[in-house]
Amino acid sequence: MISQDKNYSDDQISQDSEIDTIEAVSETEAVSETNEIIDMRDDRIQKLEVELVQAQQRERDLLLRSKAEIENMRRRNEIEVEKVYKFSLERFVSELLPVIDNLERALEMSDKSSQNLASTIEGIELTLKSLLNVVQKFGIKVVSETHVPFNPDIHQAMTILESEEHEPNHVIIVMQKGYLLNGRLIRPAMVTVSKTKS
């Protein structure tokens, strides 16, 4: 019976040993699977953290771009409003220029030696001076200088005269004054330009 008990015990030990081995393998596999799951979750967490950082960066970039675009639009609108303000008088000034020209012509053609016309001439001079002061307050600049280089941006050459007294390509006579409104040409000055004698 002892031998049977021994065999039984050996079988029991063997089975227990197999069970322990199976349990150990199962535990190892379970730990391994758990570690794999944890590793997969860690990888997923890291991936999600990277995606989160990228999404936050995209949001910051989008916010900065939006702010910059709003600032650019605000600046463009300010510039546009300023242009509208500066040049809103352009049409009015264009209509006013012939009046100024007529007053200047009236002064040129008047007989300044006549005592009868002295007060009329003085009235025209004061009216012209007052009118020019008003238009200058609104950014109107007269282009009427002579002995300056010809500038096609503000001058319109009507004639060319040979002259030894003047430098070539210079304005020697202004036939009709030109006008600028805040730097923008309203009407070019009609001028005579010098050239060297051939």
From Swiss-Prot:
Participates actively in the response to hyperosmotic and heat shock by preventing the aggregation of stress-denatured proteins, in association with DnaK and GrpE. It is the nucleotide exchange factor for DnaK and may function as a thermosensor. Unfolded proteins bind initially to DnaJ; upon interaction with the DnaJ-bound protein, DnaK hydrolyzes its bound ATP, resulting in the formation of a stable complex. GrpE releases ADP from DnaK; ATP binding to DnaK triggers the release of the substrate protein, thus completing the reaction cycle. Homodimer. HAMAP family: GrpE. Its main location: cytoplasm. The lineage of its organism: Bacteria, Pseudomonadati, Pseudomonadota, Gammaproteobacteria, Candidatus Palibaumannia. Pfam families: GrpE. It comes from the Bacteria. GO terms for cellular component: cytosol. This is Protein GrpE. Belongs to the GrpE family. It is found in: Cytoplasm. Transmembrane segments: none annotated.
